[in-house]
């Protein structure tokens, strides 16, 4: 069983990520992880932190000479700003009182749309600092690191490849997903070269203009992202229990990314507006004599199982709640009306969210692939998968 967990705070000494259940023999290096984390920092509209934040990575366990060895893989991502926060975020009690000002000023004006107020209520804090430190999207660096390990596993065993892109930001760009061309894995370099991670140059300019407008207005923007997975064989996931459906797991994984407010598979909500005769993917016999689909409205999943088509996961991200134009709130110390705290943040992080969602999709697919095929080594997993596909009648492959 593949399991993963992350630990660490936004301004703590380091983030730590661990993944357990991977087979031995996956080729993965520190350089791979560093490259993946660099992709997360890309994107027009990111804040100042992205300019000086360096992800210093250490592979702590589970990898030897660039290959997994079957034991849990642990990865540390050091916080280069830690020297500025050693007192504020000290794990141990301090011998002296810290002045309640500057970085250590109590954060008593919770932000609407953030975890601040509810987190303070839930855990009994009188300061939002402990809440925002863990709920911060900085934590997603850990998941991107683990997603890179999952990427290497999927590519090396079954040739499964994943790519993400941005459809729209702040309502600008490709607002009708039916008009979007699905990117291919070979488009990854071009996507990462785009300031907003799109292949559509017209949409790119529209999104950049909308971000510039938000900057001028001291505001933030959300958007819509899409992740596409190629090469997943039919039959990953199952219909026999609701919690084992692949689409349910993918939706949960992506919904768990900070600021994501909605997830759909394939045409999703558009399907609700179509008659049945126009909603489903009809089948035919292809030129090679095998069963093929005439469309992919289901997004590669039917009955909770992959059907062999590309898997398409789309998600909506809300605007970041740390807004320079501070929203109205209540100071929990005084009980009086106030303006919300404004922590350093981005105008938009939609391009980065696409990279994070990509990582979560990879982790989920890897989990379900291992559930289906098992294997203590990459070679064994690969043999099991090949045997499974070979067991189908020729016309069903």
From Swiss-Prot:
CDD domains: Chorismate_synthase (cd07304). PROSITE patterns: CHORISMATE_SYNTHASE_1. GO terms for molecular function: chorismate synthase activity; FMN binding. GO terms for cellular component: cytosol. Reduced FMN (FMNH(2)). Its EC number is 4.2.3.5. It catalyses: 5-O-(1-carboxyvinyl)-3-phosphoshikimate = chorismate + phosphate. InterPro entries: Chorismate_synth, Chorismate_synth_AroC_sf, Chorismate_synthase_CS. One of its GO terms (biological process) is amino acid biosynthetic process. Pathway: Metabolic intermediate biosynthesis; chorismate biosynthesis; chorismate from D-erythrose 4-phosphate and phosphoenolpyruvate: step 7/7. Coiled coil: none annotated. Its cofactor is FMNH2. Residues 101-120 are annotated as: Disordered. Keywords: Amino-acid biosynthesis, Aromatic amino acid biosynthesis, FAD, Flavoprotein, FMN, Lyase, NADP. This reaction introduces a second double bond into the aromatic ring system. NCBIfam families: aroC, PRK05382.1. Homotetramer. This is Chorismate synthase. It comes from Bifidobacterium adolescentis (strain ATCC 15703 / DSM 20083 / NCTC 11814 / E194a).
């Amino acid at each position: 069983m593949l399991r993963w967990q992350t630990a660490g705070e936004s301004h703590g000494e380091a983030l730590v990520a661990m993944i357990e259940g991977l087979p031995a023999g996956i080729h993965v290096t520190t350089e791979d992880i560093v490259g993946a984390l660099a992709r997360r920092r890309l994107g027009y509209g990111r804040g100042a932190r992205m300019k000086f934040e360096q992800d210093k990575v250490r592979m702590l366990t589970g990898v030897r000479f660039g290959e997994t060895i079957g034991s849990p893989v642990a990865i540390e991502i050091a916080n280069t700003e830690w020297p500025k926060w050693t007192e504020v975020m000290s794990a141990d009690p301090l011998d002296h009182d810290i002045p309640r000002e500057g970085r250590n000023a109590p954060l008593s004006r919770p932000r609407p749309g953030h975890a601040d107020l509810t987190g303070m209520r839930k855990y009994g804090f009188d300061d939002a600092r402990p809440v925002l430190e863990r709920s911060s999207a900085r934590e997603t660096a850990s998941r991107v690191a683990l997603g890179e390990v999952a990427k290497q596993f999927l590519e090396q065993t079954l040739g499964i490849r994943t790519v993400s892109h941005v459809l729209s930001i702040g309502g600008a760009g490709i607002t009708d997903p039916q008009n979007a061309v699905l990117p291919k894995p070979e488009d990854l370099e071009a996507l990462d070269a785009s300031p907003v991670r799109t292949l559509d140059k017209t949409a790119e300019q529209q999104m950049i203009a909308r971000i510039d407008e938000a900057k001028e207005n001291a505001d933030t923007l959300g958007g819509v992202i899409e992740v596409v997975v190629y090469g997943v064989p039919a039959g990953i996931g199952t219909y026999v229990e609701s919690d084992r459906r692949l689409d349910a797991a993918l939706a949960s994984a992506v919904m768990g990314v900070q600021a994501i407010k909605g997830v759909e598979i394939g045409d999703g909500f558009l399907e609700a507006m179509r008659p049945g005769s126009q909603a489903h993917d009809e089948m035919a016999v292809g030129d090679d004599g095998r069963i093929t689909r005439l469309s992919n409205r289901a997004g590669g999943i039917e009955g909770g199982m992959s059907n062999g088509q590309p898997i398409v996961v789309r998600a909506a991200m809300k605007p970041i709640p740390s807004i320079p134009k501070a929203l109205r709130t209540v100071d929990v110390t005084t009980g009086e009306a106030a303006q919300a705290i404004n922590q350093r943040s981005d105008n938009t992080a939609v391009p980065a969210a696409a990279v994070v969602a990509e990582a979560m999709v990879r982790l989920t697919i890897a989990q379900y692939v291992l559930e289906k095929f098992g294997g203590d080594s990459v070679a064994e997993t690969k043999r099991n998968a090949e045997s499974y596909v070979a067991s189908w009648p020729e016309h069903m492959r």
